[in-house]
Regions:
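Polyanion-engaging groove/track-forming segments
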Residues: 1-779, 789-795, 799-802, 969-974, ...
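RecB-family 4Fe-4S metal-dependent nuclease core
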Residues: 514, 528, 662, 703-995
């Protein structure tokens, strides 16, 4: 290598396998009988690349049955996107001539304060301000990496664009420029620099040192594709060293000159001071960033030599020709019309399409499972979709294949991170039931001894809390704890969580973190910090707490959860050790330089791979172009290069789903190009077997019989149950519902923090009316609204419900008072009275909302309704028999010693009618009514229905058929239990489509 004139730059073609081909060439060139490769220094892009090269050395020696050899020294440049630092070679200890880098968390908090000052009254809440500060820091880093000086923001190229921008862009660039100037002034005062600036300084110092005093030992830069100006200069210096070389992955040396020129100038303007990125540059091409790198290194593509070695698992050579043809720029792609078969050949590449993301994950897992049946075969799943990666990991667990996602898991999705965030949410939403139960039932809480007793208490109060959310914080749940029999346990919980109950005003973020970490540790103990996610959380808390205290960052309680979640999303928790030795799951950054026999590229849809280009929130695209900073479309080219590299594997599966979580998905532009390149032969590359096999995994063996309409026939001793006054119409209209409720004793469970149901609203209204009637017995002038207010307070009715329902309820209650006062011929003699009777050996029981007695001694049965009451026709058809049964109990039984003949039956509704809340309806045909039952027929008709029900179901042997009367307007709480959707089509056919 040292005999070459000019810069020593090499490229390894995609099909050769970069890591293995690199090692295959390094060993014979630099291997030493005595020292092995110890004198060689490899400069690599990331820590992941270092591990990949180490594994390649191990494979090389194992394949060639060679004895062990000393490994080369591996130095890491560090990938900013992976938040990696420079290795010791470039950033040695004691480098006092280079200022230290500012802590990134401190920078975040200080930038937020600077933005608040600059924006004044227009400043958003702190959570949004920190988000903007994070974006500001990212934009500053982009400029620093590209060597854009701060004063260039007011240079002629930028000023020339300002007048053409919208007002918000002009405002944002002014704010950004002022914040950057003030920030740099602060750094200068403290003797610090930004991390990106420090990297540039270290690159420049290393380059200068090696040029002035060239190292005696060889230095090879391998796999570096970043085109940052200072890094490009360092790579050129390495290429010029006598014992140096630069080895670039996947540079297309086969692309003809016309196509190469069509990519654009790539940093080489025709005139001094011209734009770095011209408008015609094809930034989305996978070779563009490599052309930019070569131009910044001052190296012509013709000077780059082919690395004439290949890896252990190299793909067919024609694969590189196909990849080159695949990504030809627009004008050059015209040659596809006459492209010969060799340059279209993609043998070993399969295309797989699934119906949705879940099926795609299952299909990918099946491919992995199939592949590892072959000894020594390595599989890599590459996808930028972390949700898809997590699903693949879960599907592989069915075969006990532990596959770690090397891209890591965001801290906020780990068990430790979730616990801290759930505690933060408690203070943000005033201890809402869902958040409270989620925090108390978290897997880390009381994980060891005592976990069972703890969960039993949590489940007890969980059941008691079902229904609409109360207001009042922790104190609102005391009566639920008492009802559930866990009052003592709840007192202990309240003491632990009490520090989170605050008035909502801003407080020190450091103090918040002290409180949250103390409570989390009190609940979970040392288990909170025991695993890698706990250690990452500990580092996060310490870093955030220290810098927040120094800067004085304050945050309101309702923003705490958002601020912590946004920050934790930026932290990836990677597994400390690998899973299956031949299975790996990578993100795009982690996949670079990796190698496998089978590479599965998942999530090949627009918006995922490539991602949707996002505009810089602070600097308009025209401003970035004027500054010579690549726009968001540059990343499309990088993702295209990642796909091109993946296509170099011996076997490749390109996978997508027709639908994603948001709806129908558009195939990736890269996938469409592949299909177009394959032309008529695309069908030969379709993967059909795996996609067909996937659905069979979860299908029961053999044929599955249709589920019949349920018709349970319990024995007589189980049938003999009492009948509620609200259950008779259910027994006749939908016997299965009666069977489930009264014989199986199954009840629907309300959700936590549920929307107010009519039943809940009815209970509240009944309580108010009961207390008002009782108060009127003591004081005829008692007012109903103060009583209603007191009931609302006792029940801790949530403020939102008070605002939405209370005005309508109170209007109806006031009208009820008027209606009661107008009935001067009646007297209320019973409120919420329980009653029962025996009828043909069956107990019939219920509660009367109100019973009045008229001047003739006859009774009026009143039933309160929060909504629309049953119609007279429904009562006549047997769909609403409650009033009639209450009348029968009053006649043949009693309501706590109250009995008599009932002649009036009324529904008092709180709903709106004729523009007014509160009205009375009767199912009887009285007055001017033209429909309804004759008064003398009300009780005989009801008794007839009761006799029929007792004869057929309670004392008889009729099956409790589901939906016996399809016209019965009952509830649907048992529809899932009866598996209605599985047989309702059959029901519709039987009833002529009336179901």
């Amino acid at each position: 290598m040292s005999d070459r004139l000019g810069p020593k730059v090499y490229s390894i073609a995609a099909h050769r396998g970069f890591a293995d081909a690199l090692v295959a060439g390094l060993v014979p060139r630099y291997g030493d009988a005595e020292f092995g490769l110890a004198k060689l220094t490899l400069l690599l892009p990331s820590a992941r690349a270092s591990r990949t090269i180490s594994e390649a050395f191990i494979r090389h020696f194992g394949e060639n049955e060679r004895q062990g050899m000393l490994m080369p020294r591996m130095a890491v440049i560090g990938d900013l996107d992976l938040d990696e630092s420079l290795g010791a070679l470039l950033d040695p200890l004691g480098a006092s001539d280079i200022p230290p880098a500012v802590d990134p968390t401190r920078r975040l908090f200080e930038l937020a304060e600077l933005l608040r000052t600059e924006m004044g009254d227009d400043a958003p809440p702190t959570s949004a301000l920190l988000r903007l500060a994070r974006e500001t820091a990212a934009t500053m880093d982009r400029l620093l990496v590209e060597n854009v000086a701060p004063d260039e923001l007011v240079g002629e190229p930028v000023l020339a664009q300002l007048d053409n921008l919208a007002k918000h862009w002009q405002k944002s660039i002014h704010i950004f420029a002022r914040v950057q100037q003030r920030w740099l002034a602060r750094l200068q005062e403290r003797g610090e620099v930004d991390a990106a600036t420090r990297r540039n300084m270290l690159f420049e110092r290393t380059r200068r040192r090696w040029r002035e005093n060239a190292p005696d030992t060889p230095i090879i830069a391998a796999g570096v594709t970043s085109a940052a100006p200072e890094l490009a200069k360092l790579l050129r210096a390495i290429a010029d060293l006598e014992n140096g070389a630069v080895i670039i992955p996947d540079l297309d040396l086969a692309m003809d000159s016309a196509a190469w020129d069509e990519l654009g100038k790539a940093g080489q303007s025709d005139e001094p001071g011209g734009p770095t990125f011209a408008r015609g540059d094809v930034l989305t091409h996978p070779q563009y960033h490599l052309k930019l790198l070569l131009n910044r290194m001052g190296v012509n593509r013709d000077e780059v030599q082919q690395w004439h070695r290949k890896g252990i698992s190299a793909a067919p050579p024609e694969r590189t020709h196909a990849i080159s043809s695949l990504f030809l720029p627009p004008r050059a792609s015209k040659v596809w019309v006459d492209l010969n078969a060799e340059k279209r050949r993609l043998s070993g590449v399969r295309l797989m399409t699934s119906q949705n993301s879940e099926q795609e994950a299952q299909a990918i897992a099946l491919l992995v499972r199939e592949a590892i049946e072959e000894p020594e075969k390595r599989v890599a799943v590459v996808t930028p979709d972390r949700g898809l990666a997590r699903r693949v990991v879960q599907h592989l667990q069915r075969w006990n294949i532990a596959a770690d996602d090397s891209a890591g898991q965001p801290l906020h999705l780990t068990p430790a991170g979730r616990l801290l965030l759930q505690l933060a949410r408690l203070t943000a939403d005033d201890f809402a039931p869902v958040s409270l139960i989620a925090a108390l039932a978290h897997p880390l809480v009381r994980r060891g001894e005592g976990r069972r007793e703890w969960l039993e208490a949590v489940r007890s109060i969980d059941r008691a809390m079902r229904g609409p959310r109360p207001s009042g914080g922790l104190a609102a749940y005391e009566r639920y704890a008492s009802e559930a029999g866990v009052a003592e346990w709840w007192d202990d919980v309240c003491k632990k969580l009490a520090p989170l109950q605050v008035d909502g005003g801003p407080a020190s973020l450091a103090t918040w973190l002290d409180t949250l970490s103390a409570i989390a540790e009190d609940l979970a103990g040392d288990d909170l910090w025991a695993r890698e996610d706990g250690r990452a959380l500990s580092r996060f808390i310490e870093q955030f707490r220290l810098n927040a205290r120094e800067v004085g960052t304050r945050i309101a309680s309702d923003e705490l959860h958002t601020v912590l979640r946004d920050a934790m999303e930026q932290i990836a928790v990677r597994p400390p050790y690998g899973g299956h030795p031949r299975v790996a799951i990578y993100g795009l950054l982690e996949s670079r330089m990796t190698r496998a026999d089978l590479v599965i590229c998942g999530g090949l849809n627009e918006g995922t791979w490539p991602t949707t280009p996002s505009t810089d929130p602070l600097l308009a695209p025209a401003i970035l172009r004027a500054l010579g900073v690549p726009g968001s479309e540059f990343r499309i080219g990088l993702s295209a290069h990642d796909l091109a590299a993946a296509l170099g594997a011996p076997e490749v599966v390109l996978s997508r789903s027709v639908r994603d979580m948001d709806g129908p998905a558009i195939p990736s532009r890269f996938l469409l190009r592949i299909e177009a390149l394959l032309g008529d032969r695309v069908g030969e590359h379709r993967e059909q077997q795996i996609t067909a096999l996937g659905p069979m995994l979860d299908r029961e063996a053999g044929s599955t019989e249709d589920y019949p309409r349920p018709r349970p026939k319990p024995p007589g001793d189980l049938r003999d149950v009492p009948i509620k006054v609200t259950g008779l119409d259910r027994l006749l209209g939908d016997p299965y519902q009666f069977y489930a409720a009264e014989i199986l004793n199954l009840r629907g469970l309300d959700d936590l923090d549920a929307d107010p149901t009519p039943a809940w609203q009815g209970t509240l209204a009944h309580t108010i009316l009961q207390r008002w009637h009782e108060a009127r017995e003591r004081d005829p002038a008692a007012q109903i609204l103060p009583i209603a207010e007191a009931v609302f307070d006792e029940e801790n009715v949530h403020p939102m419900l008070r605002g939405l329902w209370k005005p309508r309820l109170f209007a109806a209650l006031e009208h009820f008072v008027e209606l009661v006062d107008a009935q001067i011929d009646r007297k209320v003699v019973g409120v919420e009275r329980k009653g029962s009777m025996k009828h043909k050996g069956v107990r019939v029981y219920g509660r009367a909302d109100r019973i009045d007695r008229d001047a003739e001694g006859k009774l009026a049965i009143v039933d309160y309704k929060t909504g629309k009451p049953p119609s007279a026709s429904q009562v006549e058809a047997g769909f609403a028999l409650q009033l009639g049964l209450l009348g029968l109990i009053a006649r043949d039984g009693d309501f706590e010693s109250l009995s008599g003949d009932s002649t009036r039956f009324e529904y008092w509704s709180l709903a709106k009618k004729a523009g007014e809340f509160g009205f009375i309806e009767t199912p009887l045909k009285v007055g001017s009514k033209r429909s309804g039952l004759e008064p003398e027929d009300m009780l005989p008709s009801t008794e007839e229905y009761l006799d029929q029900a007792i004869k057929n179901f309670i004392k008889g042997d009729e099956p409790f058929t589901a939906k016996l009367n399809p016209n019965y307007p009952g509830y649907d709480e048992y529809d899932q239990l009866m598996r209605l959707e599985e047989w309702q089509i059959q029901l519709a056919e039987e009833t002529g489509g009336d179901a």
